[in-house]
């Protein structure tokens, strides 16, 4: 039975049996057989239990490693297409975490790291694949941009800052960080500027590749605690990067030409040459599927760096159909996100099929892939999202092809079933 503050037990002042506060100092006293507990102590007990559950749950999760089939199924929920890349990633990630579970090698056989290199055009889903895997496995995830990295001692971001970012994501818990995933984007931008090693120092190209070598392969990185600056008297956090999965991604623009040059060597010229017609020409995506390590060396990555990324997955360019699917099918599809926003205003949002096709066509024209879809939808809905909170009785907003093309405003359907075209201010 709960005792409200101010209600005495026969005029007697009551106190919490745990913290000793009187009924006048708390909002609620709950009575038991000859004991009382206040609302503050109940809340404190709840917090303690919640913290203990959080500490136990990661250990329980570790016992259950999703199979490659399960990982692939999770990726299918969020990422459209890229079937071959999903399969490659699912197997590589499964093997990596299996290696961590069985740290003591049998018969002296040490398992190597399965770091991954993703090659694919902008907006094809490289980052999303890595991010989704980290979310499924409930491990810390961080992203780094290779273009901002420089060798230690030069102006720019030190490669060890990547590990610091990962630690920040898990409140500087080293054990958690060592099970994390790091995605390094724009890795193609740190390619060597020419095939021949230069006399001058290439601090943002080959120099960064050299600096990343040890980090990706596995080393003990010394990171200052809580993001402080390094100084000699400081105690560092020691992070073993051999347990961290590194995924590197890049568009590698022009790599298809390198592959074609290799493939066409020895085809001959003159009367004996084999003439290729239009039907024999391959798309860039098809050509990239034939990539070999030697092509990446020719492109500008050093052999040692390529050797640290043994798993190679190629992503294809997204066509109109794939972009339409991305707009509406995944669990967190863009149209579903905006529909949820409109639902908060008690308004239904509908995208007609012709609108989805027009949005996909716009993204293809901009050559931004899936990455550009959100900004297009934001632009289409800007005026209506501005006006809607101040407009009464709107039950539904309909977006069709003409709205996407800017030829008309969204159709508003009011609660009394009247349809009206919105007028943009």
UniProtKB/Swiss-Prot annotation:
Positions contributing to ATP binding: 121-128
A biological-process GO annotation: cell division
InterPro entries: AAA+_ATPase, ATP-dep_Clp_protease_ClpX, ATPase_AAA_core, Clp_ATPase_C, Clp_protease_ATP-bd_su_ClpX, ClpX_bact, P-loop_NTPase, Znf_CppX_C4
Xref: SMART domains: AAA (SM00382), ClpB_D2-small (SM01086), zf-C4_ClpX (SM00994)
Domain ClpX-type ZB, first and last residues per copy: 4-57
Subunit structure, as described in the record: Component of the ClpX-ClpP complex. Forms a hexameric ring that, in the presence of ATP, binds to fourteen ClpP subunits assembled into a disk-like structure with a central cavity, resembling the structure of eukaryotic proteasomes.
Function description: ATP-dependent specificity component of the Clp protease. It directs the protease to specific substrates. Can perform chaperone functions in the absence of ClpP.
Protein name from the UniProt record: ATP-dependent Clp protease ATP-binding subunit ClpX
Lineage: Bacteria, Pseudomonadati, Pseudomonadota, Gammaproteobacteria, Alteromonadales
Gene field: clpX
